[in-house]
């Protein structure tokens, strides 16, 4: 940095850093790069690291740039199934478009929201469902079996199995009064509304 290069390349700069120090170093690195005003390309396989450090993120798969956008859009508005699979932050479920603002899935029922890309009514699509898209409700009559539960500090990530054997991830705040065990039934709040409907 002392030489003030026009372009700085950091290839997996934090890959060997212990997790307990990683976030602290990420924070310091972000401040240094911002203050230096040097254009920096950071190569990483950690999407969370890329989202935190980058003002723009590029997803490269099979030597091709699949998406280049701000971190929010890469996460919430992936432009291909390849990007969805690479990020591994949700699941794709079959659905049918029933109106300009709704679609139907045989397990979840009617889902409303804003389509990021228009589809003709009657189209068979794959709907991206991310962990934050569905909300827990113990009183709901729409219940699925819990097959996995991961504690992530501020939240749990539940994996639910639907009658059609689809696995759907759902976030629940860790302070929620009732935590569900494996094999228990988990209620999903209705009506289901997803702000950004992403389909392929």
Can you say where each PLM-predicted feature lies in the sequence?
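Small-residue-enriched segments and motifs
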Residues: 27, 81, 95, 144-145
């Amino acid at each position: 940095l002392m030489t003030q290069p026009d372009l700085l390349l950091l290839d997996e700069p934090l890959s060997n850093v212990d997790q307990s120090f990683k976030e602290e170093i990420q924070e310091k690195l972000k401040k240094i790069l911002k203050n230096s005003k040097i254009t920096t390309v950071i190569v990483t396989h950690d999407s969370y690291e890329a989202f935190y450090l980058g003002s723009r993120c590029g997803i490269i798969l099979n030597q091709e740039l699949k998406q280049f956008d701000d971190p929010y859009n890469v996460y919430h508005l992936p432009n291909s199934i390849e990007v969805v699979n690479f990020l591994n932050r949700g699941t794709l479920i079959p659905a049918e478009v029933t109106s300009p603002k709704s679609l139907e899935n045989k397990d979840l029922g009617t889902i409303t929201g804003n389509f990021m890309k228009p589809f003709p009514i009657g189209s068979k699509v794959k709907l991206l469902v991310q962990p934050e898209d569905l909300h827990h409700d113990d009183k709901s009559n729409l219940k699925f079996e819990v097959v996995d539960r991961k504690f992530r500090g501020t939240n749990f990530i539940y994996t639910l199995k639907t009658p059609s054997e689809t696995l759907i991830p759902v976030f629940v705040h860790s302070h929620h009064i009732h935590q569900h065990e494996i094999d228990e039934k988990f209620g999903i709040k209705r009506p289901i509304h997803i702000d950004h409907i992403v389909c392929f």
